[in-house]
C-alpha cells in the first residue's frame, strides 16, 4: 500500500529544491514581552538572545534576579500594580516581566537527522496555551525542535512563553511559510514524516521505526489539512482503549513524544 506522500507525488509537479515613567496603557511592544519567573530567567540565560530592552521586577523579584544574574542594566524595580498596567490585560506576571526581541528562526537544514531524532510540526495550532505546553513536552522528551507556520501560529511570547515554563529558550523553533514544502525539504534531508490522524487504522507505535521522524499534529477539530497529510509518509493514531477520544493537541503531542522516545532505547 502506498504512503500518503507517494500518492501525493503522482499529482504534483517536480520539487523546488534604572527607572522610567510608566504608561497606564499596555506597552506598544506588548507582543515582545515575556512574563513569569521561568520564562524570563530562561531568556536571560540564553546567550542567543539580544540584549533586554526593559526588565521589570518587584522588589522581591529584583533581589532574586541580582542573586542569580547580577544587576541587569535594563532592570526597573516597580510595584506589581504598576507592572500590570504596562503588560497586556490578564497577564499573570509573578512579579517579573521582560521586553526583548524575539528569537531568530532556525533553518530546517540545522536540524540533524540522527538516529532517534524527533521533530514536531504544528499545522494551524493557534492556542498559545497549547503551543506552550507542547514546547514544554518537547523539551522534556528531548525533541530536536518544533516547526511552526509564519502565519496561523501564536508568537513565542506572553502567555505562550509562560505556559512553556522556559522551553521557548530551550527548544529550537523553525518558522516556515508552507508546511507541505517544508516536509519535502525535510524528506530530502533524511526525515520521515508521521502525521497523527484518528481515522487511520495504523497505530503510532507501528509507524515509528526509530529513524529521524517528524511528528505532524493538526489543530483540534480540524486535524491535519489535506495537503499536509498527503506529504506525510504515514498516518497513525494514538490508541485510546477507553473509547473516548478526549485528548487535546498538547496532550496528544506529549503521548506521541513519549512513544517516539521509546524507540531510542
Report residues per predicted region.
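Short basic, glycine-rich beta-strand/loop surfaces that mediate nucleic-acid
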Residues: 90-101, 164-168, 210-218
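Short, ordered loop/turn segments at secondary-structure junctions
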Residues: 59-60, 80-83, 151-153, 178, ...
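Active-site/ligand-binding-proximal alpha/beta "capping" segment
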Residues: 194-248
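N-terminal positively charged helical leader segments and presequences
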Residues: 1-113
